[in-house]
């Protein structure tokens, strides 16, 4: 199975979600001077920021990661985390990345996710990679 790539801020909400998911994953560093390079297809898991506005919804570290042409070419889907308090901007980073990278928006969850989110994403990611492999 291919990997997940994720970003998590100092709050560690997304990191805790990824740990609970128990799938292979690589983390985009908090320190923007450190670069993550991927060499295989991945699904991006990204939190949404900006407090309910479009500006700043995608973390700067994720933008920097996707601005690397190799990293951008290997993205196959996106999953977003967010806060329902942001209203229409809930998980907006996922919408933006899916549109700009022309990949499917696979799932969205709130904060650290629920047990149902974990089960749904685990099943969905596993099936997604099986379909990708079958079409290769």
Swiss-Prot record:
Coiled-coil stretches noted in the UniProt entry, renumbered to this chain: none
InterPro entries: Flavoprotein-like_sf, RNR_Ib_NrdI_bac, RNR_NrdI
One Pfam match: Flavodoxin_NdrI
GO biological process: protein modification process
GO molecular-function terms, A-Z: FMN binding
Organism domain of life: Bacteria
NCBIfam families, alphabetized: nrdI
Function: Probably involved in ribonucleotide reductase function.
Family statement drawn from the similarity comment of this UniProt entry: Belongs to the NrdI family.
Protein name as it appears in the record: Protein NrdI
Species this chain originates from: Erwinia tasmaniensis (strain DSM 17950 / CFBP 7177 / CIP 109463 / NCPPB 4357 / Et1/99)
